Amino acid sequence: MIMILYWSLPMILFILGLFCFVSNRKHLLSMLLSLEFIVLMLFFMLFIYLNMLNYENYFSMMFLTFSVCEGALGLSILVSMIRTHGNDYFQSFSIM
């Protein structure tokens, strides 16, 4: 029973984060926050899975390191976008 709770809660929160990421496309900051929430839920599911199989947590630390680098890269893109465009509206940003 407790294992179902361990797996269902992160899955529900992961799906909720995906829904927020897809539906909230107005500001880049809100998209980055929902993306970090998705990565946090993936880390939580990976941690539960590795502990269930009695593996070491080395891979989870590597995953956490890469997710921190992804967050820093997203913040640097946000700062450069605010400096060049003056706001973080995602519709005003053209990739081309």
From Swiss-Prot:
Topological category with respect to the lipid bilayer: Multi-pass membrane protein
Bridged cysteine pairs (disulfide): none
Enzyme category, top tier: translocase
Cellular location(s): Mitochondrion membrane
Gene Ontology CC entries for this record: mitochondrial membrane; respiratory chain complex I
Broad class of the protein's primary localization: mitochondrion
Molecular-function annotations in GO: NADH dehydrogenase (ubiquinone) activity
One Pfam family hit: Oxidored_q2
Enzyme Commission number: 7.1.1.2
Purpose of the protein: Core subunit of the mitochondrial membrane respiratory chain NADH dehydrogenase (Complex I) that is believed to belong to the minimal assembly required for catalysis. Complex I functions in the transfer of electrons from NADH to the respiratory chain. The immediate electron acceptor for the enzyme is believed to be ubiquinone.
Protein family membership: Belongs to the complex I subunit 4L family.
Descriptive protein name: NADH-ubiquinone oxidoreductase chain 4L
This protein's encoding gene: mt:ND4L
